[in-house]
Amino acid sequence: MDSNTITSFQVDCYLWHIRKLLSMRDMCDAPFDDRLRRDQKALKGRGSTLGLDLRVATMEGKKIVEDILKSETDENLKIAIASSPAPRYITDMSIEEISREWYMLMPRQKITGGLMVKMDQAIMDKRITLKANFSVLFDQLETLVSLRAFTDHGAIVAEISPIPSMPGHSTEDVKNAIGILIGGLEWNDNSIRASENIQRFAWGIRDENGGPPLPPKQKRYMARRVESEV
């Protein structure tokens, strides 16, 4: 096993512990808590994959961070902060919407690019809106936290979420996953609209009508992929 992989995991565990302490002291906001829960699942998945104990990894991570801080100067910290752009957190969904349990009558699942696409194929002839929570860097979607599809009545009928035990995903991975989800839902004559944030930061476009953020050619390609799988 690569030593850098182990070191990275140990440091991530310790930094998560620090963030958890902030949360316990009510010193953070809702997006912070949202990321904390997501990262906890990811760390458990990575720990299982690497065969490492989280508690031991956290202690080792503490030693690594303390050694780095001993040699870190305030001037170096200022330079690092000035040169590193900070990601923004975009929230289409409330905490209730992103954490609500939902069920599928005719479940369909597909893994693509470190993302899990789930949809209920029993849903037909509905108007569906896609909402997502994600981080943005350089005015482009960086990391997807969760994307869910809602009917006009607020029922959840589909979801895209990162797989904790797998490495990160790219913007293209998210686009492909959304394409698969849209194609699968449109196959059953549902009409899909995406939030303005999804259109803007995933595809860099604005559609005032809220239509699916896919060009017709790509939509047909994705629909054929879903059709062949169904």
UniProtKB/Swiss-Prot annotation:
Residues 1-73 are annotated as: RNA-binding and homodimerization. Upon interferon induction, ISGylated via host HERC5; this results in the impairment of NS1 interaction with RNA targets due to its inability to form homodimers and to interact with host EIF2AK2/PKR. GO terms for cellular component: host cell cytoplasm; host cell nucleus. Residues 209-230 are annotated as: Disordered. Residues 223-230 are annotated as: PABPN1-binding. Disulfide bonds: none annotated. Gene3D superfamilies: Influenza virus non-structural protein, effector domain (3.30.420.330), S15/NS1, RNA-binding (1.10.287.10). GO terms for biological process: symbiont-mediated suppression of host cytoplasmic pattern recognition receptor signaling pathway via inhibition of RIG-I activity; symbiont-mediated suppression of host gene expression; symbiont-mediated suppression of host mRNA processing; symbiont-mediated suppression of host PKR/eIFalpha signaling; symbiont-mediated suppression of host type I interferon-mediated signaling pathway. GO terms for molecular function: protein serine/threonine kinase inhibitor activity; RNA binding. Coiled coil: none annotated. It comes from the Viruses. Residues 180-215 are annotated as: CPSF4-binding. The keyword RNA-binding applies. Pfam families: Flu_NS1. The dsRNA-binding region is required for suppression of RNA silencing. HAMAP family: INFV_NS1. Homodimer. Interacts with host TRIM25 (via coiled coil); this interaction specifically inhibits TRIM25 multimerization and TRIM25-mediated RIGI CARD ubiquitination. Interacts with human EIF2AK2/PKR, CPSF4, IVNS1ABP and PABPN1. This is Non-structural protein 1. It comes from Influenza A virus (strain A/Pintail/Alberta/358/1979 H3N6).
